[in-house]
């Protein structure tokens, strides 16, 4: 049997990331054969992975990578079982290594099948499952290209990408701010104009059903009833609807005894409140129609207009 030296153990540890004792045991079992020892460690990983395949892996790290000319970005989540492992330096380093490789692929399946120092990425994850002792897998995987792409990562839990139409002077600031918005608030589409009318109607019906059910219970308990909405998107607010809202506001002011000469100062605010109260779907799911988190006096779309560019895409991944 070959003599196993500390240098041999350290070399295997550097190659696989396995613990010192695991590396020594593998080298002893392999009688000093380095390649065989690596295979032994991988087989251990496969056994651990098989035993933990049904475990929930909702912890981990969300990471991002942008290429040198800011025209392409990647975000992934590397998932594990516990927050303790998710915060481990070696684990986060692996996540960052993986996302730098991920940028060269269009989807997660291609990436998992790609080479990682002689084995596939999928096999590397199995290997690391054996090393760490927890289920390790790629969760979220998103790629985004554009004239300029920027990113934002929130405490290694959520990552977002934003692409804009031109590489302007303040592109990094804009894309980071919008990515922060995407990470914090989420969004399904860019604008309310992208909503299918049938989707809006189905959402409205679903929300009305929930509110009416809640109101039945509130009425039974003698509590205040919730308002049942007629509209939830600006796409439903026709000029006639807006005009009627203005007329209703005038009637309200008249009933309150407000002098007509001050109505022009009050009406815009009331109409704007009507619009805000009846566009909840837009505020939840349409990025440009959300209140900007860094200045809620304006919409994201208003903030973006100040840069004279357009948002051409956005992506988001999150743990859990």
Swiss-Prot record:
Pfam family, one: EF_TS
GO annotation, cellular component aspect: cytoplasm
InterPro entries in the record: EF-Ts_dimer_sf (IPR036402), Transl_elong_EFTs/EF1B (IPR001816), Transl_elong_EFTs/EF1B_dimer (IPR014039), Transl_elong_Ts_CS (IPR018101), UBA-like_sf (IPR009060)
Gene3D superfamilies attached to this UniProt entry: 1.10.286.20, DNA helicase RuvA subunit, C-terminal domain, Elongation factor Ts, dimerisation domain
Keywords: Cytoplasm, Elongation factor, Protein biosynthesis
Localisation per UniProt entry: Cytoplasm
Superkingdom assignment: Bacteria
Location of the region described as Involved in Mg(2+) ion dislocation from EF-Tu in the Swiss-Prot/TrEMBL record: 82-85
Signal peptide range in chain numbering: none
One GO MF term attached to the UniProt entry: translation elongation factor activity
Entry similarity comment: Belongs to the EF-Ts family.
Name of the protein in question: Elongation factor Ts
Originating gene: tsf
